[in-house]
């Protein structure tokens, strides 16, 4: 299974969307600053994740979530979660 996920950085108010085959490992990489794009983030919170059966489906979904309408979907999801407790 491939997981498409979204994280939020509170100080910058930025949303990052990615995909991985090991969400725990990937979140640890983000938090340790081992991801080129997210190493500038200081308060990373996972707020959305969904699994896809294969890489191709996951990549299509990732592209959608990075689109304008996908970003709006994620903003709605972000407002529905309590970021004080991570998923």
Name each region found by the language model.
Residues 1-35, 42-66, 71, 76-87:
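GIY-YIG nuclease catalytic motif and its immediate N-terminal context
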């Amino acid at each position: 299974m491939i997981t498409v996920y979204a994280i939020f950085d509170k100080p910058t108010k930025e949303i990052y969307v990615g995909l991985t085959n090991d969400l725990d490992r990937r979140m640890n990489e983000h938090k340790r600053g081992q991801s080129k794009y997210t190493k500038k983030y200081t308060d990373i919170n996972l707020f959305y994740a969904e699994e896809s059966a294969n890489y191709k489906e996951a990549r299509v979904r990732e592209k959608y979530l990075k689109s304008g309408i996908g970003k709006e979907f994620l903003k709605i999801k972000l407002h529905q979660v309590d970021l004080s407790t991570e998923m």
